[in-house]
Structures are given as C-alpha cells and as structure tokens.
Regions:
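Conserved ATP-driven helicase/translocase motor core recognized via long
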Residues: 55, 174-362
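Core structural elements
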Residues: 100-111, 162-188, 341-347, 362-375
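Walker A (P-loop) phosphate-binding loop of P-loop NTPases
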Residues: 29
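A conserved segment at the C-terminal end of the G1
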Residues: 37-41
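Conserved NTP-handling cores and scaffolds of large molecular machines
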Residues: 44-47, 73, 77-81, 109, ...
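ATP-hydrolysis module of ASCE/P-loop NTPase motor domains
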Residues: 53, 94-101, 119-191, 303, ...
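Conserved helicase NTPase motor core
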Residues: 7-10, 15-16, 21-25, 33-35, ...
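Conserved P-loop NTPase-based nucleic-acid remodeling module centered on helicase motor cores
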Residues: 53-159, 213-217, 445-449
Length: 453
C-alpha cells in the first residue's frame, strides 16, 4: 500500500507541495501512480485543510488507468478508515469515493455536455457514433462534396486534382483532406487553424518565411538529422581509436564531423543552408605498409561514413539547393495548392459536422470541442472562461492530470479553463518519452514547453 512506502525526498515534495500549479516529469518505473494516489490521500486527510474527494478532478487518458486509479484510492481510504474507525471525515470520504471524479478526458467532456447541453443548443439525445459509422458518413460527405466540385470545375480545383488525384482515382486527394481535417480538429478552433495554414504561405521575405510554423518545424527536423549524423561520426571515430593505427581515417572523420556538428547548431534556415553547403568530404585514406589496422574494420567504418555522406548530400540537394528568390517562389506556388486544400477541408468540416448533427451523432473529437464551447468563449482578446467554467473552477480544489504528455491543445484549453489563476491548482504528471497518443494528435511538446519555463 502507498501509505507503507518509503518516499524519496523528491517524491515527498511532490506529495506535499500546495498552493501552486506543479508539473512533474516522472520516468517509467518511478512510482508516479503511487505518488499521485498518495497526494490524493494526503489532500483529503490534511489536518489543517481537508478536502472532500469529490472536490478533486483526476484526469487520465485511458479507462483502464482511471479504473486502476479509482481502485487504489478506494483501497487507501479503506485502510485509513480501518486505522481510524471513529473518524467521520474519513468515513464520509469512503462514501464519496464511489462518486469521485477520477475519469478520462473524454468521460469528463461527456459529463459536461450531459449537464450543460442547453448552453450550446445541443440535442440531449445525442449518442457517440462508432468508428465504422463515422467512416461511412465521412465517405458519403466527401463523395457528395467532390461531385459538386467536379460539376463546378473551378480552375483552382481542377489544378489541385490534376496534381494530387491524376486519372480517375481521387483517393490521394481524399486522404489529404482527411489528414488536414485531423490536424485541424486537434486544435481548439479548427476553422481559425485552417485559415492560419493559408497565411503561413504568404511570406514576402526570407525573414518572414523563416518565422512560419511549418518552416520552423522543418528547420528543427533538419537540425535533428544533422545532430544524429554527427553522433554517427563520433561512433566511427571511437571505432578508429579502439582499433588503433587508424589516425589517417580519424583525421578525415573528425574534420567532417566538426563541419556537420557546426551546421547542426545553426538556429535559422539560412544559416543552416550556408553551413550545410560548406561541408566538404575528404578522400579515403590509403593504407600504408606500416599501418596495422584490420581491413575489415576499416571497411566497416568507411561504409558507415558513405551512408552519412549520402545523407548530407541528399539534404543539400532536397532542402538547400535553392536561393532565397527561388524558395519564395516555391512557397507561393505551394500556397496556391494549400489554399485549395484548405478550402476543400473547410467545406468538408462544415458538411461533416452538419451531417453528424442531423443524425444526432458525436465523435470523440466533438466531445472535446463541444465541451470547450461550453467552457471557453473566443473573444478578440483570446479565450475567456465562461460562467459554466467558473462554476467548475469553484467546484474543484485541485485538478490532477496523469499522463500529461498525451494531452493535445483542445484538452489543454479545456482543463486550464476550469483551473484557478488566483490560486493555481493544476497538478500535472507525465513522461514525454512515453507519449502513446500521437495517433490522436497528442502534443507532448506541451509538456516540454511547461517543463522548460
């Protein structure tokens, strides 16, 4: 049982810290679930300010995890009651534990909608559609949409389909629409996000282009590839040193490794391009009669080096061959296609939402967005919590989020809208290395952004 555990000083601090929001990075096997359970128990058993368990919101990302957490908490409370049978507060917690808000984010959103459907004029008889039903509905909506577009035959649509759906097969275009739709609905305001996609391709200068989100992402990914390649060189150099007598190889590899590492440290695209294009590869050293190293070992090292060389040359040709003018031209050409894709995706989003509402269906993404509409209002100054959110804020003394690395931007806004700002009460725990919900567009970088503050 958690009460019998010996806590480390760090775990004890996590369990006991109060009156502030807290983000805990906990690796697998570090006992984070036990720590979370103990924090819950200490909150409800606090001698100075005991909290009823139904005033805590504990959110995790799987039904199994929520069930396990509930069982652990109930067992821990039962043990405290056994030790203190006359404690009326503990006996009350034992009763309340059956109604404790230990839940998945989807279940919490569902409860918000069941209680406040009238706030967004939602039919209370809605039901959650199954995956097969949704796929059929998506296919019907897309088929009708594309049929209308073909009939209207606008120039932008025809050019888009010629590029991405040659012949009579629309499948690639359909998949692009669905993929972009998936990214859009993983954001709090999907239509705003789609509009921003178009704006991202309107740069008139390299300075502006380098600030676009897609360009920043690409630059970071290229830097990562270069860093990994530099690390490969370090391994090659280590092999040379272990073998001995390979100073000529080591000299060539060290020179190349330094150039690649220098390139990986560039912070902007134009610096990255300049440094990558300055990388020069040396010739293979000839083995002298006096050299004692193994030919097999030398071949293994040089084969690895050739792979790294191909990687760098491929990056140079694919990403760094164009000057500023050509890059801006390509961006504008891509922007034309992106604009059409966004238009089609936006049309699909509206039609698909209307089709679901007509059938009184919601999917899991709808649960989150509809709950968000109940809890947060978009204003010219940004998102503003609603009166309903204020009620939840008063209801919950603390909001505990397990597996925080699996949150996306919609879930983040939902939970922050019901958290307190005057008395911060968010407790978040997770491990960015264990993000398992990328397929649902979880954003583990949310964890890193908070962790680095």
């Amino acid at each position: 049982m958690a009460d019998n555990m010996t806590w480390t000083s760090e775990q004890k601090q996590v369990i006991d810290l109060r009156d502030r929001s807290l983000l805990v990075s906990a690796a697998a096997g570090s006992g984070k679930t036990a720590v979370l359970v103990q924090r819950i128990i200490e909150r409800i058993c606090d001698e100075s300010h005991p909290v009823d368990i139904d005033r805590l919101l504990v959110v995790t990302f799987t039904n199994a995890a929520a069930g396990e957490m509930r069982e652990r908490v109930q067992a821990a409370i039962a043990k405290r009651v056994e030790e203190n049978p006359d404690n009326t507060h503990l006996r009350r917690q034992e009763v309340l534990a059956g109604h404790a808000h230990i839940t998945t984010i989807d279940s919490f959103c569902l409860s918000v909608l069941r209680e406040h459907f009238q706030e967004i004029e939602l039919d209370p008889g809605f039901r959650i559609a199954d995956e097969g039903e949704l796929k059929l509905l998506q296919a019907d909506v897309l088929e009708a949409l594309l049929e209308e577009e073909y009939e209207q035959a606008s120039e932008s649509f025809i050019h888009f389909m010629e590029a991405y759906a040659p012949g009579k097969d629309d499948e690639r275009a359909v998949q692009l629409i669905l993929q972009l739709y998936g990214f859009a609905v993983a954001n709090p305001r999907p239509e705003d996000w789609l509009n921003h996609c178009i704006e991202s391709y309107g740069a008139e200068s390299m300075e502006t282009l380098e600030k676009q989100p897609w360009m920043c992402t690409m630059t970071e990914q290229l830097r990562t590839i270069l860093s990994e390649t530099a690390a490969l060189y370090k391994r090659m150099i280590a092999v040379c040193r272990d073998e001995g007598g390979m100073e000529s190889y080591e000299s060539v590899l060290l020179s190349e490794q330094q150039m690649i590492e220098y390139a990986s440290e560039a912070s902007k695209y134009d610096e990255l391009r300049e440094r990558v294009n300055l990388i020069r590869f040396g010739s293979k050293p000839r083995k002298k009669k006096t050299d004692s190293f193994s030919e097999d070992k030398a071949k293994r090292v040089w084969d690895m080096r050739e792979q790294a060389k191909k990687q760098i040359k491929s990056l140079s040709e694919d990403y760094f061959a164009d000057d500023d003018e050509r890059l801006l031209q390509k961006q504008h050409l891509a922007g034309v296609q992106v604009k059409e894709l966004v238009r089609l995706t936006h049309a699909f989003l509206l039609r698909y939402s209307a089709a679901k509402r007509k059938k009184n269906l919601v999917d899991f993404g709808d649960l989150e967005h509809l709950a968000l509409n109940v809890l947060s209002e978009k204003t010219p100054d940004g998102e503003k919590p609603t009166l309903v959110a204020a009620q939840y804020r008063e209801s919950f003394e603390e909001i505990m989020i397990d597996e925080y690395q699996d949150s996306n931007y919609v879930q983040e806004l939902i939970l922050t809208s019901i958290s307190r700002t005057d008395q911060p009460n968010l407790f978040m725990v997770g491990d960015v290395k264990q993000s398992i919900y990328r397929f649902r567009l979880a954003r583990p970088e949310l964890f890193m952004e908070k962790y680095e503050i």
